[in-house]
């Protein structure tokens, strides 16, 4: 374990090199600050992948919010404006599965310290309505997750079980090693799984406040790659995301430094 941690630190210590921009990627930014990246890729045929990446993770949580970045990722699948998951319409998961997009395999998300990413993969392009609906899902994740009281309470139990199953010896070693790996840094105490006390007891408004504060277009990027017409997808994306407002007096997204560790 020590060998792994030491090598992990060495990797972190390497200077970041700027990646070259693929000339085949269509890159643009909407007036609200949303950035998008679209690329045609002929293989696999008649398939496309959708991603929405947030420059948001557990590093931005306040002490009373420990675990809410990860909790919010779960809530993104539990009801949105256009996919409510109730008597008025299918939720995201059942709708996707009716189109052959399997939850956990083709429909998923992850939360890390500095980012949260959602994906819809292996989407068939033959039916343009499916492609349009996937754009609508990205829209809802960006700004229209419901966060209903009853769904939050249901998800507390799901997160508790995930917390329990992940609370292994290896995770405890990693958690305890953070203060050594990142001395005097906020990175020393911001594991995405969070605090079980917070998960059990946070007020509903706390997660709504976190969502409103950090899920905003200037911190979001859309990535669409596949066997698609780039011009058509770009036009659709601009139309779908036109109603997402730019933030007013947005909170600063601080990028916390990590000091060199000589020991």
Where are the language model's segments positioned?
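Scaffold signal of the M16-like zinc-metallopeptidase fold and its non-catalytic homologs
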Residues: 75-80, 109-114, 130-137, 141, ...
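Mature N-terminal segment immediately following signal peptide/propeptide cleavage
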Residues: 17-52
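Bacterial Sec-dependent N-terminal signal peptides
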Residues: 1-15
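An aromatic/glycine/proline-enriched structural segment found at the starts
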Residues: 184, 221-263
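Second-shell loop/turn segments in exported
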Residues: 38, 55-62, 75-82, 117-127, ...
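M16/MPP (pitrilysin/insulinase) zinc-metallopeptidase core fold and M16-derived inactive scaffolds
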Residues: 49-121, 173, 189-193
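Acidic/histidine-enriched alpha-helical segments
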Residues: 88-94, 146-164, 229, 248-262
């Amino acid at each position: 374990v020590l060998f792994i941690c030491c090598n992990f630190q060495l990797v972190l210590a390497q200077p970041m090199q700027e990646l070259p921009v693929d000339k085949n990627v269509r890159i643009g930014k909407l007036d609200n600050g949303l950035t998008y990246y679209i690329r045609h890729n002929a293989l696999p045929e008649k398939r496309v992948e959708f991603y929405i990446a947030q420059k948001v993770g557990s590093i931005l949580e306040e002490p009373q919010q420990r675990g809410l970045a990860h909790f919010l990722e779960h809530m993104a699948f539990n009801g949105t404006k256009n996919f409510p998951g109730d008597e008025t319409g299918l939720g995201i998961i059942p709708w996707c599965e009716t189109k052959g997009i399997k939850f956990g395999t083709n429909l998923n998300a992850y939360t890390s310290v500095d980012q949260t990413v959602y994906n819809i993969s292996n989407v068939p392009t033959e039916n343009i309505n499916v492609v349009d609906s996937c754009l609508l899902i990205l829209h809802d994740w960006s700004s229209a997750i419901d966060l209903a009281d009853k769904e939050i309470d249901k998800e507390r139990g799901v997160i508790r079980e995930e917390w329990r199953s992940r609370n292994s010896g290896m995770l405890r070693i990693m958690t305890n090693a953070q203060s050594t790996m990142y001395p005097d840094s906020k990175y020393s105490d911001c594991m995405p799984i969070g605090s079980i006390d917070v998960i059990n007891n946070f007020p509903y408004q706390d997660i709504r406040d976190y969502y409103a504060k950090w899920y905003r277009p200037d911190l979001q990027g859309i990535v669409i790659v596949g066997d698609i017409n780039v011009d058509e997808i770009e036009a659709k994306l601009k139309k779908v995301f036109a109603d997402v407002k730019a933030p007013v007096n947005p909170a600063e997204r601080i990028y916390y430094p990590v000091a060199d560790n000589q020991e």
